[in-house]
């Protein structure tokens, strides 16, 4: 059954999912074909069940999923619950890659791997400036990802401890939530 689900995906979407999220084919088939690449390298859902969602609260407690390092030796762990915009996720990813390229030059393409474990899948709505109250919620303007306390949004491997710590420090300045560096033991 899993093979049939993978057949519905285009080759490009599977390649993008495996390149940027580094997931297996089984996870891609569970995810479906609704994730596409747009606006440089930002991934977000092509369509959702509803076009507008309520804000909801970010969970303050620790969740079992995503609180342990799953892929790499180093990572960043969120210290508190919050929301990450798709722009902040992409900026943090680019800052990490830029740090590795400056520090490692030729070794970057051979050894280094970065995993982004959050996906901005909730639309944010907004109304234009100087519009009167009422008349609906507003049009979707961007995408966010909910991050709970203790969740690991970024992981990295194939680099030295000092380079990973420096890259995590640079990436922590991009999102609005506080993070700390974690190491696999």
From Swiss-Prot:
Protein name: Large ribosomal subunit protein uL16m
GO cellular component: mitochondrial large ribosomal subunit
GO biological process, one term: mitochondrial translation
Pfam families, per the entry: Ribosomal_L16
GO MF, any single term: structural constituent of ribosome
Alphabetical list of PROSITE patterns matching this protein: RIBOSOMAL_L16_1, RIBOSOMAL_L16_2
Subcellular location: Mitochondrion
Keywords, in A-Z order: Mitochondrion, Ribonucleoprotein, Ribosomal protein
Major subcellular site: mitochondrion
Keyword Ribonucleoprotein: yes
Annotated family: Belongs to the universal ribosomal protein uL16 family.
């Amino acid at each position: 059954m899993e093979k049939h689900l993978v057949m519905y995906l285009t080759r490009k979407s599977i390649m993008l999912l495996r390149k940027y999220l580094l997931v297996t084919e089984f996870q891609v088939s569970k995810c479906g074909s609704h994730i596409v690449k747009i606006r440089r390298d930002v991934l977000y859902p092509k369509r959702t069940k509803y076009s507008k969602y309520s804000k909801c609260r970010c969970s303050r407690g620790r969740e079992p999923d995503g609180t342990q390092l799953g892929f790499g030796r180093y990572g960043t762990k969120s210290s508190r619950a919050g929301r990450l915009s798709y722009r902040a996720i992409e900026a943090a990813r680019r800052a990490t890659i830029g740090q590795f390229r400056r520090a490692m030059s030729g070794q970057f393409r051979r050894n280094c791997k970065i995993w982004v474990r959050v996906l901005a899948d909730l639309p944010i709505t907004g109304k234009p400036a100087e519009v009167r109250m009422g008349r609906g919620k507003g049009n979707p303007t961007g995408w966010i990802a909910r991050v709970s306390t203790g969740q690991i949004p970024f992981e990295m491997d194939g680099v030295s401890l000092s380079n990973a710590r420096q890259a995590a420090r640079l990436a922590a300045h991009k999102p609005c939530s506080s993070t700390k560096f974690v190491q696999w033991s």
